[in-house]
């Protein structure tokens, strides 16, 4: 379950930011997760609760925001949204696509006190 290691990285960021900016608690965290990031949301939520114990983010509400997967189609020269990384172009049916977004995961923001 790589969601555990993802949350360990998030914890490191939270602890670093708490030291830098002097906050003691995170009450809410919003994560942006791309469609192709390979993150299982239920596993991430569970891992977040476990890994954040004893950190400023313990008990924080985790909100996950879905980001679409987009690719450039070389057959029709359009940027398209994909449901699956291996899907053909929804506009022309072409298969020559270069993924542009959808594999990212980032902290969008945190509410702190």
Curated annotation (Swiss-Prot):
Any one of the GO BP annotations: protein modification process
Binding site for Ni(2+): 2
Residues bound to Zn(2+): 73, 76, 89, 92
Keywords assigned by UniProt, alphabetized: Metal-binding, Nickel, Zinc
Keyword Aminoacyl-tRNA synthetase included in the entry's annotation: no
Domain of life of the native organism: Bacteria
Membership in a protein family: Belongs to the HypA/HybF family.
Cited function: Involved in the maturation of [NiFe] hydrogenases. Required for nickel insertion into the metal center of the hydrogenase.
Protein name (database record): Hydrogenase maturation factor HypA
Lineage: Bacteria, Pseudomonadati, Pseudomonadota, Alphaproteobacteria, Rhodobacterales
Gene: hypA
